[in-house]
Design a protein with these regions (language model features):
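Short, well-structured beta-strand/strand-turn elements
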Residues: 38, 51-65
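Second-shell loop/turn segments in exported
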Residues: 18, 30-36, 106-114
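Intrinsically disordered, Ser/Thr/Pro/Gly-rich linkers and terminal tails that flank
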Residues: 87-138
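Active-site-proximal beta-strand/loop segments in catalytic clefts of secreted hydrolases
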Residues: 32-36, 58-61, 82-86
């Protein structure tokens, strides 16, 4: 992902996570997200989606990325202002809009949030089982 401070004159800076040596899992990964995937979870989603074996499923993330700049006020209060723009590797900004999944699933329907969560988990298991069966046929 990339970070930048708007109107600062400083260019956007790419952020990378470098792979370490040793054993790595390279099999399929389903990343389950929803509207309660926020902030650091969204940064993790951006990073994981860059991997070829990861598929995001579930709901669109919250769209609340930026870290805050906290400033104390004379009366003792603290004001916190969003001060960064975080984008995907291609420059797309997901602030407010969130990151839409590749495979949409309703995670927490208003009429049955717990049941919806378990239905989404079961669907994820079905997708993993289908992908495993497909790979075994190769």
């Amino acid at each position: 992902y990339r970070t930048m401070v708007p109107r600062s004159g400083i260019e956007a800076r790419p952020r990378y996570a470098r792979a370490e040596g040793g054993v790595r899992y390279t099999g399929p990964v389903l990343l389950l997200t929803s509207d309660v995937t926020v902030s650091g979870g969204e940064l993790a989603t951006l990073g994981l989606r860059a991997l070829p074996n990861v598929v995001q499923i579930g709901g669109t993330t919250r769209g609340s990325f930026s870290t805050v700049l906290a400033k104390p006020l004379p009366n003792g209060w603290v004001v916190e202002l969003s001060n960064e723009v975080i984008s995907g590797p291609d420059g797309e900004v997901f602030e407010e809009a969130g990151i839409a999944p590749e495979v949409p699933l309703e995670m927490f329907p208003l009429d049955d949030p717990v049941g919806g969560y378990f239905r989404a988990l079961n669907k994820a298991i079905e997708l993993m089982d289908a992908d495993t069966a497909k790979q075994e046929d190769l």
